[in-house]
Amino acid sequence: MKEALSSFDVTAVVKELQRYVDWNLDKVYQPTREHLILALKSRGEGKEFINFFVGKWLFRSTKTKEMPQQPTDFAMMLRKRVSNARLTGVRQQGFERIIVLTLEKDGKYELVLELFAEGNVVLVKDGIIIQPLISRTWKHRVVRARREFAFPPPIPDPSEMDQGAIMEMMKASDADIVRTLATRMNLGGRYSEEACARLGIDPHR
C-alpha cells in the first residue's frame, strides 16, 4: 500500500469515483480519527464504500469490517447533515491532492477530502464551513466552523505549463530536480523518479 497519493493518483481516483454520481450517501462511519468511511447505495448496484484515510489515501470497496456501535461526534454531524443526500459530483481541485464531493439534500453541500500534509475533512455549505474534522489556522488560510471556506494557494498544473515555465521553476528551486518535481509540481517521489529516468536526467542534480 502506498504511503500517500500523488496528484496524478488523485486524478485517477476521481475518475473511478464518477461511478457513484447519482448514488445516495447512506451513512458515515469513523472507525478511527484518521479513517472515514462513506457508505453509498444505489437501487441497481446495492451498497459500496469509500474509505478515506486522512492525508494519505482513498479507495473504494464492496465490503467493510464491523463498525463501532457508538459513532464519533464528527460522524454524527455528517449523518445529521448529509445522510440520504444524493452525490451529484466528484472533482479534483485543480491539480491539488484534494477531492470534492458535491452532495444535495436541503441545498448543496461540499465534502472536501484533503490528502496533502496532515490532511482534513471539511463539510461546506454555501461557501461556509459547517465543521472541519481538524480546525487549523495558517497565515494564508483559516479552517474553522462558521468561517468562509477557501482552498489552499494553488500549485502548478504541469499539463498547463510550457517548457519555459518549468525551467524557471527549476532555476528558482534550491532542491535537486527530483525533489522539485515531487514537491513544487506535486508529482510525488515515484513519478518524479520515473520522469527523470525516462528523460535520462540525473534526479539529484
Annotate each language-model stretch with its function:
Residues 2-3, 7, 20, 43-205:
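Phosphate/anion-contacting hairpin/loop surfaces
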Residues 5-41, 45:
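N-terminal-proximal low-complexity accessory segments that begin disordered
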